[in-house]
Amino acid sequence: MVGSGMPETYELYQMLKYVKNVVDKYGRSVIVPSELATMITKVNGALDTLDASGFSESEEIIFDVPSELFTYWDTVATAREDYRSKVSFYFSGNTTEYDAGTLSNMIERWLREMKAGMQRAIKIGSHGDGDDGKSGIPPSYFSYNITSWELNGKKNKVGLPLADAKSMSVGRFPLFLEGPTRYLKTIDDEDNAAATMYEKVKTSGLRDEELSMYFVSASLKGQSYDMGRMMAFTPGWLENQSIWMHMSYKYYLELLRGKLFTEFFSEMRGGGTCYCEISNSFSKCSFIHQLNSCLYRNVTIHGSATLWTFFDGMLFFLGKFCFC
């Protein structure tokens, strides 16, 4: 399976914004390994080719990757793989220096392209049981099906022929809470975007109304087993629509950062371990990495910890909200 994860994109976007702000603030040149400079040159060349192609975004959702974007992806992905191969054991020791102005302009260009890609991802959306892809909630994952390829004359370790992809189409997955959680970091809150996103998530398939918490994923019904081990679990258990406290806390933290204070305290009343009823099992406060959601077939243990991994719920709470 060829795939991509949007959460990493959102995090990279934030990192680049930070680097640009620091470069603009101090105006100092930056020295990088020559191997990284080579990759940067290839990435900028791919952007030059994309700009020269005259590519423009379509108003319609297109699942077949346009040839211009495929060429861009292929060039950048190859550059990344070449870089990793060269530095897997050591760097050469050679360096390249970028002045602040050049570096700032480069990063600004990268940010524009990433922003366009993030908007494209939201337009393509998610897809699953009861999800028509029009929720406007940022997706977390995509898969890519290779639609045409050419044999390159090479073979793998067991003698099977290898091929180079020439085109591909996009496959969608259900919503995961990590998508909007990471995306909220990128919002500068123009037009109350954070509040709008919060309302979308609250009314989506990610909400466990019985527990007033959030599933780690929406329904996985009908998904391919290529998704991995999460498909082996019954709904409401472990990785299949259970409650992941560490991801929920990250989501609540973004509500705070977005100045959604009323929404934050409302969610914490249902999702914070500090508000667990005293009569509840001690396990709910001790080993609370994952909880059984309202979808689990045994209703008597809804909201109870799975005890699969031993993370302290209170440590998650303290780490996220008391020392951040």
Region spans (language model):
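Acidic, mature catalytic/reactive cores of soluble proteins
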Residues: 1-324
